[in-house]
Amino acid sequence: MTKKVTKIVAQKRAGRYNIYLDEQYAFPISESVMIKFRVFKGMEVDEQLQAAMIAADDVSKAYTRALDYLSHQLRTEKEVHDKLRDEEIDESVIDATMQQLRDMRLLNDQQYADAFVRTAKRTSDKGPRVIRQNLRQKGVGEQLIDDALAGQFSAEEQIDNASELARKLAKRYHRQAFKTMQQKVRQGMMTKGFDNDTITAAIASLALEPDEDEQWEALVAQGTKLWQRNRKYAFRERMMRTKRSLFQKGFMMDDINRFIDEQVADE
């Protein structure tokens, strides 16, 4: 059944219009859809054309929402898709909207990944593995991630960033036994996403050496707590438990024996 456009009324919202067919309100459309279908007063509209205009308007509205979402920062295809889905937009409309965004070059996961890696290496202490995990969560494909990391985060830059992180971690744990400090530095760097080769190179670049005075102070501080905690045991058991705990914490046995000797002398 064919009807005729008898009235086109602008809505209060800019760029939106109400279409009347045979003097009856029929449907709303955007200005872009009206231009696309060349809608004019007196135009004949059958059911198929009306359905096509309504479908195009659904895409137009979804496209506008996507543009608003993209206006704040770069987004991946998955982020935009999920945003539209969360707004309960039909999947077919989302697919058409996503293609329109691609055609307009408003979605590009490679550019997103490149920018993400550049920002992460400059403003954070994240290594490649954590950056990869972040990009995966945002829906970026493995090959795109590989290309971004290879092009934006060189091996030299990774060692530089890892060295700075190692320096911070060494400072944080400097009151621990030197061996324990080294283990925690390495563990912390692994948690941040650096690989073993990079970690080894970074630690080597710092040329970390134990400070004898600091190590002794740390041993005394921890040893005193252990010595007091173990006072309920017989002397030999107390001594062995304290020694074992200090050794497990990474202190040198010669220093441990010296500490124990001093405790025995004081009692």
Swiss-Prot record:
GO BP annotations listed: regulation of DNA repair
GO cellular component terms listed in the entry, alphabetical order: cytoplasm
Compartments, as annotated in UniProt: Cytoplasm
Transmembrane annotation, as ranges: none
Domain of life: Bacteria
Pfam families, A to Z: RecX_HTH1, RecX_HTH2, RecX_HTH3
Broad class of where this protein is predominantly found: cytoplasm
Keywords (A to Z) from UniProt: Cytoplasm
Classification via InterPro entries: RecX_HTH_1st, RecX_HTH_2nd, RecX_HTH_3rd, Regulatory_RecX, WH-like_DNA-bd_sf
Acyltransferase as UniProt keyword: no
Function of the molecule: Modulates RecA activity.
Family stated for the protein in its record: Belongs to the RecX family.
UniProt-recorded name of the protein: Regulatory protein RecX
Organism: Lactiplantibacillus plantarum (strain ATCC BAA-793 / NCIMB 8826 / WCFS1) (Lactobacillus plantarum)
